[in-house]
Amino acid sequence: MKFPIETPRKQVNWDPKVAVPAAAPPVCQPKSATNGHHPVPRLSISSRATVVARMEGASQGGLQTVMKWKTVVAIFVVVVVYLVTGGLVFRALEQPFESSQKNTIALEKAEFLRDHICVSPQELETLIQHALDADNAGVSPVGNSSNSSSHWDLGSAFFFAGTVITTIGYGNIAPSTEGGKIFCILYAIFGIPLFGFLLAGIGDQLGTIFGKSIARVEKVFRKKQVSQTKIRVISTILFILAGCIVFVTIPAVIFKYIEGWTALESIYFVVVTLTTVGFGDFVAGGNAGINYREWYKPLVWFWILVGLAYFAAVLSMIGDWLRVLSKKTKEEVGEIKAHAAEWKANVTAEFRETRRRLSVEIHDKLQRAATIRSMERRRLGLDQRAHSLDMLSPEKRSVFAALDTGRFKASSQESINNRPNNLRLKGPEQLNKHGQGASEDNIINKFGSTSKLTKRKNKDLKKTLPEDVQKIYKTFRNYSLDEEKKEDETEKMCNSDNSSTAMLTECIQQQAEMENGMVPMDTKDQGLENNSLLEDRN
């Protein structure tokens, strides 16, 4: 249960962002050693009222955080699973014992009725019901009730009032009258908040005491150059051990001695009481067969008060741990995602840059290899052609060179251009000797251009060549065409956009052609145009 308070209590929370600013003793909060990491949060000694103080401080500062629905549903599912698991375990442990008790009671009732024939089963059931009602009213049906102490004497009534405002509610005694029930309602409404203020104050004092002790322990470990995280863990363990010794172990030993319980029953009662569960199956000072001292029950209630403050501090500390762990987990997950995204971007950029460099290098190497292969093929072709020409006779070599380099084309063109003048100057004997004057004029009139006539003359000349020369010419002609096709395919595969390499290849090709005696196409076309102009003038 949460208790409202007027002012935020002094505390040092695990989470620096959520912690309420409060003035704490300087001894309890020594300066943490800066080691390059985030400061480790300090343990808090707080009670259930701390939750209300934190909520008030957050609402005043406008920084109140609301839990998301997904988180609420997840926690609800976890709680339901936890409840189902607990129910299954309790049923497996307690149901066999309950069945055995039922069988035992049934056998004892049957044996009693068999031994006491004068008692009817209805009378026995009525007696048992009266005993249960008396027990529920707080009167023990065991023994002589006139000699035992009353459940509503001053000590017992004080203890009952303490169980009401502490919300423990053992249930061993309860008001039976209407006036008592009405007063219990009003008493709980005003007494529970009042006890909450008292519990918060005691929690502050316990926090101060334990804070000073923890600060001394941290000072000792800090001199030994122990890491801050280890110091926090050690101080937490010492805090829990000290509380367990003071509020659990020592009271359990006392209850075992006074109440006659076993060690397990004593520890069970202590934990159930300080966690405000209060089943009521074991109650200190509830045994009618024991004569308790008058101060026993008030002392038990004072132990409950201080023990509740300690357990509230422990529960609050556990809640702070879980909250800090969840926030740290979220921050670590966010950092991991950010690092992963940054690493992915860097790897992608490096991969793209590497691929671009490799593509450029491979492209350059392919282009250079294509150029080198083209030059080697041309050089090999020229060497083979020169070797073949060396094997021919001088006459065939001159004819083949004239056909290959285009010199015959120029000489035949000059003869054609000069043919009309020769026909005019020379006599009829020479015309009859050659017998070609009229045929050449007909050829000029028929084709109408010197270029067509030149091509025709070349074809006629090729027909008159010997067969061995024609075969050699065709072989080298096909070889040249194959070389040109291979060069074109290589250029298409390379997809070269570098104009300098193309110009270099073209210059090398033109130079090789000029060395072999071949006339460039531009020069050939220009020569044809000049010859046409001279022919028109004539």
UniProtKB/Swiss-Prot annotation:
Which biological process terms from the Gene Ontology are attached to this UniProt entry? cellular response to arachidonate; memory; potassium ion transmembrane transport
Q: What is this protein called?
A: Potassium channel subfamily K member 10
GO MF annotations, alphabetized: mechanosensitive potassium channel activity; metal ion binding; outward rectifier potassium channel activity; potassium channel activity; potassium ion leak channel activity
Task: Kindly name one Pfam family recorded for this protein.
Answer: Ion_trans_2
Main subcellular localization, coarse class? membrane
Where is region (Selectivity filter 2) located?
Answer: 276-281
Summed up, the tissue specificity of this protein is: Expressed mainly in the cerebellum, spleen, and testis.
Which organism does this sequence originate in?
A: Rattus norvegicus (Rat)
The gene that this protein is the product of is Kcnk10
Cytoplasmic compartment segments: 1-71, 203-233, 320-538
Question: How is activity regulated here?
Answer: Activated by stimuli such as mechanical stretch, acidic pH and polyunsaturated free fatty acids.
Gene3D superfamilies given for it? 1.10.287.70
State the UniProt keywords alphabetically: Cell membrane, Disulfide bond, Glycoprotein, Ion channel, Ion transport, Membrane, Metal-binding, Potassium, Potassium channel, Potassium transport, Transmembrane, Transmembrane helix, Transport, Voltage-gated channel
Q: What InterPro entries does the entry give? A: 2pore_dom_K_chnl, 2pore_dom_K_chnl_TREK, K_chnl_dom
The free-text domain note is: Each subunit contributes two pore-forming domains 1 and 2 which assemble to form a single pore with M2 and M4 transmembrane helices lining the central cavity and M1 and M3 facing the lipid bilayer. The transmembrane helices are bridged by the selectivity filters 1 and 2 carrying a signature sequence TxTTxGYGD that coordinate the permeant ions. Up to four ions can simultaneously occupy the selectivity filter and at least two elementary charges must translocate across the filter to convert it into the open conformation.
Name the residues that bind K(+) 2: 168-169, 277-278
Q: Which GO terms describe its cellular component?
A: monoatomic ion channel complex; plasma membrane
